């Protein structure tokens, strides 16, 4: 019985050693997953939007600095088109919807500023006329100018000369009002020009998003047709 156990133990040991040798003799494979070979793209690459944006900006900057409002509006339109080419598709759509919501409000503000400027300009003209009349009256009374009527000379009455202090105050007030109106009108002109520029930028951006650049590719700017509203 003991000899049978010893023989069985020896057989198990030999079998275990043989399995161990077979396991060690196996070739190990790297654990990393093999990747397929990379091939260079053979399809023609579409025109890069950032490249087109840089070309548009170069076109805008190649001209001289805009001296008139029309030239400044032109450069703002160029910048908006370049921005539309540079932005991502989703960002373009977000900006387009925001511009459509803001543009009517900007136009309403622009109309209000123009009405305010017209009122201030009319006030400026009235103040200028008042200042001119009071200056002429004060100067005539101070120089004691005599007028000839039917061959007889008529001097300015004394009661009119007594109005010189009041006319001087009116002239001073009209002059001060002219200065205030002129300053306010300049400020309004700057605001109006700025709003006009913003309206031009937003309209140009939306036009760039909507339009299809057939001279660059047959695919619209956003990759799909947009309904023109």
From Swiss-Prot:
Superkingdom per UniProt: Viruses
Subcellular localization: Host cell membrane; Host Golgi apparatus
Membrane topology: Multi-pass membrane protein
Main subcellular location: host cell
Gene, per the UniProt record: Segment-10
TM annotation in the entry: 119-139, 162-182
Claim: Membrane is one of the keywords in the record: yes
Name listed for the protein in its UniProt record: Non-structural protein P8
GO BP, sorted A to Z: symbiont-mediated suppression of host innate immune response
Family that this chain belongs to: Belongs to the orbivirus NS3 family.
Leader peptide range in chain numbering: none
Keywords of the record: Host cell membrane, Host Golgi apparatus, Host membrane, Host-virus interaction, Inhibition of host innate immune response by virus, Membrane, Transmembrane, Transmembrane helix, Viral immunoevasion
Role of this protein: Plays a role in the inhibition of host innate immune response. Interacts with host OPTN and thus inhibits the recruitment of TBK1 to the host Golgi apparatus. In turn, downstream partner IRF3 cannot be activated and IFN-beta production is impaired.
One cellular-component annotation, GO: membrane
Subunit architecture: Forms homooligomers via coiled-coil motif. Interacts with host OPTN; this interaction inhibits innate immune response.
């Amino acid at each position: 019985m003991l000899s049978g156990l010893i023989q069985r133990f020896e057989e198990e040991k030999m079998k275990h050693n043989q399995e161990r040798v077979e396991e060690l003799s196996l070739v190990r494979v790297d654990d990393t997953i093999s990747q397929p070979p990379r091939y260079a793209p053979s399809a023609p690459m579409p025109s890069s939007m950032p490249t087109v944006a840089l070309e548009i900006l170069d076109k805008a900057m190649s001209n001289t600095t805009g001296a008139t409002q029309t030239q400044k509006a032109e450069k703002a339109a160029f910048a908006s088109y370049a921005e539309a080419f540079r932005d991502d598709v989703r960002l373009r759509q977000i900006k387009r919807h925001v511009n459509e919501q803001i543009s009517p409000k900007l136009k309403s503000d622009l109309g209000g500023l123009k009405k305010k400027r017209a009122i201030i300009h009319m006030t400026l003209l009235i103040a200028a006329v008042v200042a001119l009349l009071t200056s002429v009256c004060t100067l005539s009374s101070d120089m004691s100018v005599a007028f000839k009527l039917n061959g007889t000379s008529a001097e300015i009455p004394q009661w009119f000369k007594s109005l010189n202090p009041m006319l001087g105050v009116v002239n001073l007030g009209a002059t001060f009002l002219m200065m205030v109106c002129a300053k306010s009108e300049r400020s309004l002109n700057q605001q109006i020009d700025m709003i006009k520029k913003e309206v031009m930028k937003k309209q140009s951006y939306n036009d760039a998003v909507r339009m299809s650049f057939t001279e660059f590719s047959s695919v619209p700017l956003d990759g799909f047709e947009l309904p023109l509203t």
